[in-house]
Amino acid sequence: MDTRKNVSGAERKIWSLIRDCSGKLEGVTETSVLEVLLIVSRVLGIRKEDLFLKDLGVSPTEEKRILELVEKRASGYPLHYILGEKEFMGLSFLVEEGVFVPRPETEELVELALELIRKYGIKTVADIGTGSGAIGVSVAKFSDAIVFATDVSSKAVEIARKNAERHGVSDRFFVRKGEFLEPFKEKFASIEMILSNPPYVKSSAHLPKDVLFEPPEALFGGEDGLDFYREFFGRYDTSGKIVLMEIGEDQVEELKKIVSDTVFLKDSAGKYRFLLLNRRSS
């Protein structure tokens, strides 16, 4: 139960403020009221459910901060950079500018990975381009596997490490800065599964304004979006391993030219979303 006092003195009624702020986000997002509720609850330090308490008020200082953040969101700045966190697989992940925000559809990649881990008794997993650590930390959290994660961004490595500590898996989630699996060359032979949500957006693609605030190296995969896959499969011998990666829905035919013996899987929306290569001997 929230212990904040009801409206009095110079405090403003919270729902008057929420209505005004929601109007500022119309045309920016389809979930303007929800986003304002999340921003307000963040500033006040209470659950958004407690905002429904009758006559709850905000101080002038709190109102000023809320308005600043709403204006920032209205400019296109990503909501989850403002909130400083994003839920993924039922877990709260720290995110900040310079780190890719995990997407809901990537939860399906993690669920597929967990099924394969259970089926084959996999003990060692790699996560390339870990970002916030959403994939790798979730795998470590919901299985007994050890995860070796990499990212080219120092900021991402820092945040991923914090998220591993936050969710109690820092003893099984190890992250280093570098491209592909180069930082863990000495572990490559022992890695049984390789996961990634790589940059696969075409360089010419037109993206929503808020997405453009995210690190371009986590989004764009060259002219046709396939640079990552070409380099990865050209560089590494995946014999004896399982590779599971996210892909663009229109990239299946071109990916077939890059790697053979691959299964392409659809997501819950019926779109091709995952590349699965199983080269285990059993």
Curated annotation (Swiss-Prot):
Methyltransferase keyword on record: yes
Gene3D superfamilies noted in UniProt: DNA helicase RuvA subunit, C-terminal domain (1.10.8.10), Vaccinia Virus protein VP39 (3.40.50.150)
InterPro entries: DNA_methylase_N6_adenine_CS, HemK-like, N5-glutamine_MTase, PrmC_N, RF_methyltr_PrmC, SAM-dependent_MTases_sf, Small_mtfrase_dom
The reaction(s) this protein catalyses: L-glutaminyl-[peptide chain release factor] + S-adenosyl-L-methionine = N(5)-methyl-L-glutaminyl-[peptide chain release factor] + S-adenosyl-L-homocysteine + H(+)
Binding-site list for S-adenosyl-L-methionine: 129-133, 151, 180, 197
UniProt KW keywords: Methyltransferase, S-adenosyl-L-methionine, Transferase
GO molecular function: nucleic acid binding; protein-(glutamine-N5) methyltransferase activity; protein-glutamine N-methyltransferase activity
Catalytic activity, EC: 2.1.1.297
GO annotation terms (biological process): methylation; translational termination
Enzyme class label: transferase
Binding, substrate: 197-200
Record's keyword annotation contains Transferase: yes
Miscellaneous comment in the UniProt entry for this protein: The crystal structure corresponding to PDB 1SG9 shows a glutamate anhydride cross-link formed between the Glu-97 side chains from two molecules, but this has not been observed in other PrmC structures from T.maritima. This cross-link is suggested being an artifact of concentration during crystallization.
Family: Belongs to the protein N5-glutamine methyltransferase family. PrmC subfamily.
Protein task: Methylates the class 1 translation termination release factors RF1/PrfA and RF2/PrfB on the glutamine residue of the universally conserved GGQ motif.
Subunit relationships: Monomer and homodimer.
Record's protein name: Release factor glutamine methyltransferase
Species whose genome carries this gene: Thermotoga maritima (strain ATCC 43589 / DSM 3109 / JCM 10099 / NBRC 100826 / MSB8)
Lineage: Bacteria, Thermotogati, Thermotogota, Thermotogae, Thermotogales
Gene that encodes the chain: prmC
